[in-house]
Amino acid sequence: MNVFARSSVLAAEMIDVFDRTHTEKELVFQSKELCRDFIHSRITREGLSWSKVELDLPEPRGVLVDVSVVLLKLGDELECMRPYVYRNIAKQLNISVSVEAVVSDAFLSVATEVIAMGITWGKVVAIYAVAAGLAVDCVRLGHPVMVHTIVDSLGEFVRRSLVPWLKKRGGWVDILKCVVNMDSRAHVHWLSTAVLTWREFIKTMYVYLTK
């Protein structure tokens, strides 16, 4: 291969890398898509119904599908550890789910407190579990429209607080490392992270209720 051919290949590879660089808009969009899938899974599990289909919003595809599966599996593991923590969120926060601003502010307050001491995948999964638990409450109490408020609030939270962290890890694909080739030490690390997240979540509930 001559120097010009090598230069062309290198240029193409650089363009490819640049194209794979996630923008803020892409990360927020992906985060909201994952949130819709997570919420839809939890609502369906509870025997309720809610359509996550919105105009001009394509279904997740490619690697985002794998990310969604992993996120749900990690959520299952976290919820199994403390099943009552991520249920009846509205009651725990003592809020009415009929007011959009109240639902949004409550979720953002909890999410912000959860990562106050740093961000981990365990905490990110916990935030999704909180969003889903709150969404289930909204549907069960007759306010399914609030599900979209929760999804939008999560998107805003990601934009404010998670985008730089996600970029450093190459995007959502990094979460796949939590379950791929998981050895015993990695499993213990995930569980310890989840327990820490649970403790911080309980503390967050207390902080919110005593404001």
From Swiss-Prot:
Gene3D superfamilies: Blc2-like (1.10.437.10). A motif (BH1) lies at residues 113-132. One of its GO terms (molecular function) is channel activity. A motif (BH3) lies at residues 67-83. A motif (BH4) lies at residues 32-44. It comes from the Eukaryota. Belongs to the Bcl-2 family. PANTHER family: BCL-2 RELATED (PTHR11256), BCL-2-RELATED OVARIAN KILLER PROTEIN (PTHR11256:SF48). GO terms for cellular component: mitochondrial outer membrane. This is Bcl-2-related ovarian killer protein homolog B. Keywords: Apoptosis, Membrane, Transmembrane, Transmembrane helix.
